[in-house]
Amino acid sequence: SLTATGVIQILADYAQGLIEKGKSAAEVAERTDIFKTRVHAIAMVDTLEFLQKGGRISKTAAMIGELARLKPLITLTEEGGVGVIGKAIGKNKAMSFMLKWLEEHPVDDAWPKYSIYTCGTENCEQFEEKLKNHGIETMGRLQIGAAIGTHIGPNAFGIIYVEKA
């Protein structure tokens, strides 16, 4: 998945910097392992249909959630899985939740930030505008790969970034 690739790119850049400073392989591995806890990928799921089709939620939960315009907010966990960090009613409240998350887990501007999306960039573009209004500029846009995209469906969007230490 390109999302994972974005996270891996940040980790590789960090490790490369340590190597250039003459750190040992063991120290590079140890420090990178600690650093990876600061790298986050958060996203909003636009539809519950694909979570239901993938067996992640029941048909009833999907139907009720869709009627309520429920938008799950997810992140990659330290174990490499996907975890729910919150839920919002509607896309705008989901974006507000994500911006609040970024305030509580502040962005380290020394590292690149990437906006992420499944298919369809409209939501991602709106989120990038809100990020910009909050002083957060992304370096580029990465499409979420099929491994995750098939489970979260179209029009999902988010950000990959490094949290301040």
Language-model regions: role of each:
Residues 2-165:
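Mixed-charge interfacial surface used for oligomerization/domain docking
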